[in-house]
């Protein structure tokens, strides 16, 4: 019954286009102020806000469409209702005579459940609740609107499907799982992208432990042009939020990753390709194509386990009806062949990962990055002091931290080190407002803080100018530098004569 209900489309879908929902797309479900990122797959049950449904009927419709969830789990496109003409509502002057004794509603919970079982829509249930309320007409007009809004939120199951973006995903993570993004608020992320001058064609370095949200925001703004080098701790980068963006494969060609524990060897000039081969072979593979390789590896591992379990069960059970001559001989090569294919595929992925690491090392070795973004749970001072050497002069850098004290220490160390200007430690202040006729005011509940930012620009310090290995670089930055002292000296001699 559920399958038949989910397969019946509510209306013929429009022709597919760039702004339409396709099978396999990553989308964001929205209900009131709650968001959830999912992937559109046919006949896959999705649970959202204590309701389950299928996304089959959403395929082909445009992003931003609203759907009603029916009792069978199918989505029905919600048509735009014409707003009724303004009618004079019967309302009271105040609520002083209204007593909340729990007896004002004639409908019981059993009656409401019976209405739901009959398949009555939420709008009709809300209308019956209004008609059976003995105190609704005595409420003020504002109280009536508040009552209707509250009942609609409870009984109307309206789901809006949105296209993923930096703003939507940052709001979703900050509301649902702020710990996974280091409590970075969405306005703070916007400030980071602006202060870091993220744009197409840049060569950026990012070190983040925010589930890939900062990385995805940078990739979205760069639009697939330029290169991003992600430094990661541990076995591999975490890009759960990056996968929710649903970037095409062309965006991943300019994305590189490099282990954080090899940065010091790269700075000292002792880095070599053999150091990458000494890493553990069972490290987490690079998530290409939004995690398809990881899912493929898990599926292959599950198939291998099923084959092994089947072999053990067949050997342990004695069933004459199932014994076929030659089966054990044919099964053993099949097992070996599947294991061999799995090992070869794993080695191929490791070799590709090693090549990408070498390419990232070559890009970092040029030391001409256009910017640096740091947003991690680690102390920012050692990270920033090490990674600034890979950034070209006159380029911005931005460091995020949930707390102010680590950034103050980082600020002091940068002042002592030199090579930076325009240092600024800032905190953004955000406040939401309710904007309604005669009821506009700041909301009572607001965010206590969204983190702190330390930003600045790199310059060529005196120690770098004195370094003979960088004379050619500084000379290229200012070709007339060698002529200025001679001209000034000649001018002084003329004045003395």
From Swiss-Prot:
Query: What are the start and end residues of every segment in region (Substrate)?
Result: 95-105, 146-155, 176-183, 415-423, 434-441
Q: Tell me one GO biological process term.
A: mRNA processing
- Compartments where found: Nucleus
Bias (Acidic residues) occurs at: 289-307
Sorted alphabetically, which keywords does the UniProt record give? Nucleus, Phosphoprotein, tRNA processing
Q: Where is the composition biased (Basic and acidic residues)?
A: 328-354, 478-487
Positions with a binding annotation for substrate: 349, 377
How does this chain assemble? Answer: Heterotetramer; composed of two copies of TRMT6 and two copies of TRMT61A.
Know the name of this protein? tRNA (adenine(58)-N(1))-methyltransferase non-catalytic subunit TRM6
